[in-house]
Amino acid sequence: MKEYRLTDWLPTTKKEVELRGWDELDVILFSGDAYVDHPSFGAAVIGRILEAEGLKVAIIPQPNWRDDLRDFRKLGRPRLFFGISAGSMDSMVNKYTANKRLRSEDAYTPDGRPDMRPEYPSIVYSQILKRLYPDVPVILGSIEASLRRLSHYDYWQDKVQKSILCDSGADLLIYGMGEKPIVELTRKMKELLPAEDASLTAGELKKIAGTIPQTAYLCRATEWTPAADDIQLYSHEECLADKKKQASNFRHIEEESNKYAASRITQEVDNKVVVVNPPYPPMSQEELDHSYDLPYTRLPHPKYKGKRIPAYDMIKFSVNIHRGCFGGCAFCTISAHQGKFIVSRSKKSILNEVKEVMQLPDFKGYLSDLGGPSANMYQMKGKDEAICKKCKRPSCIHPKVCPNLNSDHCPLLDIYKAVDAIPGIKKSFIGSGVRYDLLLHQSKDAATNRSTAEYTRELIVNHVSGRLKVAPEHTSDRVLSIMRKPSFEQFETFKKIFDRINREENLRQQLIPYFISSHPGCKEEDMAELAVITKRLDFHLEQVQDFTPTPMTVATEAWYSGFHPYTLEPVFSAKTQREKLAQRQFFFWYKPEERKNILNELRRIGRQDLIDKLYGKRNK
């Protein structure tokens, strides 16, 4: 087990800054999460990236915004900027359930305390810093800011909100994975400094704001000159007046997010213009390795000694092997934030991190996950990448697997076997969700098909901790098409394979399917049929959720506007509490307390034929 000193973490207090012998800081980061020095926690990654650039960086985790604001003053003014991360989750998803009830636990806070971050920390922290230090640049990052960079529907306010740049007063927003833009930003900032001991002002930042990819900023409409190839969205005011325009905007936003080479996007709001610069091309393997190979302690800061951080407990024995997801699910923000192009770490970097994990206290030889946004997309990309560079499809596997996709599972099998061969590793489990549509896909390449069959058996026999998570999400092909998910028949086919391999290997593992109710396009009748089908398959569902509209997804825009952003055709969504509960109850057809309501609902919608299938003829 490694021994660490306090100075092995980035400083969080004046005393820790002084322990390093520093008398000033270049960058001060504020985070809505506790400080865990681990590559799964965004503030730690950005802090370490900036440290590797030779900057003096401190992190102030979960500052108190309700007192005399001493946490915002205690380290003074940085030379370059304040950086703000609301945390690893959108703060409103973190604080509220799909029914807008306050959650009792915050997984990213010591002992799960639910009161250590405000709603919208991106706005609250930024406004405080602008009040205290009006001329110091404030840079927003994290998923909360990233997905609110343009006009967006906010479920908790139940209205279309302006770009978060408007309400926060921040000077610049970095969207997506922030390593490349933050490095370029700081390098250009340093070039602007007139002397070694000088500080940068917000006014000086404006000189370079338009030159940094993957950032967004505000400027006065009178100062803005659009380029011919800019994509000019409907203004915020037009979107407020016409829901169809808000839906139409989203198609452009998503398509540009999924392009290899995107256009600049602009949107007018309040006599200003939000300018969203195109993203960087995907990171190289070397760049991703660099981010993960930085000197993380992989531990919570010592200030939390004796306290449990639930989110850390979940991932402390896991290793992330790639970024990006080309699934393009309509309700998911991963591709909007990480992109659809897969960037994979090298085998050497992964194995080095596994060896680091093995040094952690309490490690007993079991890795909880070797995965990413999806379990089985490692090193997958286009056979001809020139085709990918012209493509704007949101998904490489829906409605069908792209013929240009190389779905070879051999590189992933090689990683699993190399990890399991390390002395001291007893078992590596796969906790990420498995895309069974990739496992069932029949490529024109026989070797690829053999690798897929081998991977399927290897996964089920050696990497399941008793239960394998998969996400069919629904049984209705119509709803699944809106979700951009494969037909439920594919899940049934995969279940047969799973059950057969379990019989052959004398295993007693469970397949755990995840389902969503109240998704746009889903009606009570669809949920009733879901209940009948899952009963036939002998599932008593546990992993279920109501659809929660979160910013910057196709499903959210359809839910709010009533129109599908790509077709502008009307889409039904369950919105009232009664409509949502009427759908949700069908997950639990097997519970005696739900039976009466379900029977009444089936009669109300004229589907008495399903009563026999759920409960038998005597209940008609």
From Swiss-Prot:
This is UPF0313 protein BT_0254. HAMAP family: UPF0313. Gene3D superfamilies: 3.30.750.200, 3.30.750.210. Transmembrane segments: none annotated. InterPro entries: DNA_methylase_N6_adenine_CS, Elp3/MiaA/NifB-like_rSAM, Methylthiotransferase_CS, rSAM, UPF0313, UPF0313_C, UPF0313_N. SMART domains: Elp3. Binds 1 [4Fe-4S] cluster. The cluster is coordinated with 3 cysteines and an exchangeable S-adenosyl-L-methionine. Keywords: 4Fe-4S, Iron, Iron-sulfur, Metal-binding, S-adenosyl-L-methionine.
